[in-house]
Amino acid sequence: MADKQISLPAKLINGGIAGLIGVTCVFPIDLAKTRLQNQQNGQRMYASMSDCLIKTIRSEGYFGMYRGAAVNLTLVTPEKAIKLAANDFFRHQLSKDGQKLTLPKEMLAGCGAGTCQVIVTTPMEMLKIQLQDAGRIAAQRKILAAQAQLSAQGGAQPSVEAPAPPRPTATQLTRDLLRNHGIAGLYKGLGATLLRDVPFSIVYFPLFANLNQLGRPSSEEKSPFYVSFLAGCVAGSAAAVAVNPCDVVKTRLQSLERGVNEDTYSGFLDCARKIWRHEGPSAFLKGAYCRALVIAPLFGIAQVVYFLGIAESLLGLLQEPQA
């Protein structure tokens, strides 16, 4: 990507198209990942990704799997555009006379891209996590209320079902966070997001560039689209699993609502320490399989759109009548 100059509007459009397609395809898996990561050992409601999705459909309907998708679809365009364009920019700045970047420089470019994207990623994930996890907490409270009613009635079937609490909306959450905490409320978990996204980009972009280079027919030609797709999938899933422990901590820190008897956390280290002590080291890999399934096609699609130059074609069509 460093050897090809692409206009800023094209970068933004390519990133936006890729993000919208990717999020639409994999959002239910991302919802399962959030709920699996947030459930603590004493309050397990879901045994696996498929179990989570089946229970979500039964209790919340098909569209329950897309809770929080509107936030992602709105903000994923600037997020993906910033990430891809920033990496392209840093690679170009670090390259000299079109020479191939060394691995340290590739990692530095990825670091810059990961740092830039958290401007959008942190508030996006902050809102998305509340909306995604609301169904899990509501279901848990409903089960506990039914159990309490059964106990109070001596085992008799409860006659009246407790009404479900109203679901929060992204607008309500944003308004409440800004009113109570200011702009800092939307950026809760910023440090954890940086610790996840910067290492992710350091791993992803150099790995993708080298895998993509392997499938290039010659130094003068672009890689075929399927090579870019596979390179994006492999690099994305590898980077996603590598930083999953930080993603678990970030998800826990950004969750405002807690289930019954669930731990609260004062910061990154406190959260990591409590997870290790109460749930064991395997808890840091919760949702890793889901995250790999989300990230692989997301970045595979992104790289295909980026390398096919869909935005350049669209911009070219718009400019043709003026020629």
Curated annotation (Swiss-Prot):
GO terms for biological process: L-glutamate transmembrane transport; regulation of insulin secretion. The chain crosses the membrane at residues 12-32, 62-82, 107-127, 189-209, 223-243, 292-312. Gene3D superfamilies: Mitochondrial carrier domain. It is a multi-pass membrane protein. The lineage of its organism: Eukaryota, Metazoa, Chordata, Craniata, Vertebrata. Its main location: mitochondrion. Solcar repeats lie at residues 6-93, 101-214, 223-312. One of its GO terms (cellular component) is mitochondrial inner membrane. The gene is Slc25a22. It is found in: Mitochondrion inner membrane. Belongs to the mitochondrial carrier (TC 2.A.29) family. It comes from Mus musculus (Mouse). The keyword Transmembrane helix applies. Mitochondrial glutamate/H(+) symporter. Responsible for the transport of glutamate from the cytosol into the mitochondrial matrix with the concomitant import of a proton. Plays a role in the control of glucose-stimulated insulin secretion. This is Mitochondrial glutamate carrier 1. It holds the Pfam family Mito_carr. It catalyses: L-glutamate(in) + H(+)(in) = L-glutamate(out) + H(+)(out).
